[in-house]
A protein has these predicted regions:
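Mixed-charge, Lys/Arg-rich low-complexity intrinsically disordered regions
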Residues: 1-15, 86-87, 94, 100, ...
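Short amphipathic alpha-helical interaction elements located at domain edges
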Residues: 70-79, 87-116
Length: 116
């Protein structure tokens, strides 16, 4: 997804020079012509704590200004996984399968116990 003005983003990398860690939320406040984005980070009072030029590979869009909606969870996960190395992506897939299988077993067990 191409970032747009006022989209909400989540950092994928630490930015020690700005004292920002991966996972920090910010907002695109300017789109530069060279495919970099000026991203503003604020504190709880809405005061700017950092203004950083970032490449799109350094963050994920998590809130779309145009639609005024959060990125659906499945899309958020998929976008994050695409930034992982192949082996880490396979670990995520294995974990998702584990969770799915566990949920299926719980559903089967509760259905059996309730007599349905």
């Amino acid at each position: 997804m191409t970032p747009a003005l006022f989209d909400g983003i989540e950092l994928l990398v630490d930015l020690p020079a700005y004292q920002l860690r991966a996972g920090t939320l910010g907002a695109v406040v300017h789109v530069h012509s060279d495919a970099t984005y000026e991203v503003e980070f604020t504190n709880e009072e809405g005061e700017t704590t950092a203004l950083c030029p970032l490449a799109a590979e350094q963050f994920l869009v998590v809130w779309q200004a145009e639609t005024r909606s959060w990125l659906p969870l499945a899309e958020h996960i998929a976008a994050l996984v695409t930034h992982l190395p192949e082996d880490a992506g396979r670990e995520v897939l294995d974990f998702a399968r584990f969770l799915h299988e566990r949920r299926q077993r719980q559903h089967t067990t509760s259905s059996t116990q309730s007599g349905t």
